[in-house]
């Protein structure tokens, strides 16, 4: 938590400590809560990239467990639209645009397509300006 809420970008030992969180999380789920191996493997590999550039192992494509590929898509979207140290918060539309651009590199293309078909571009509660100049949203 101290690293997550600290100064970003991380360097040196802090960066390496942060990169160990998938393995630590998977081990915690396995030993403390007896989650099935398929779940803990998904947690451990949720920072793997579809093209093999991720961590902690460097797996690619369908060698990355399905749970990990799903967590990668959903966790990345949440991270992009949330306020986090060291990165700009994106609008849902910008996050979706990024995910579409990175499908096949960072993300599994089929899972991005499934996620985006089920995801609203304008989540509940956001303000939308209509072409006639009217505002729509929860507050209006």
Where are these regions (language model features)?
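Histidine- and acidic-residue-rich, metal-dependent catalytic cores
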Residues: 1-140
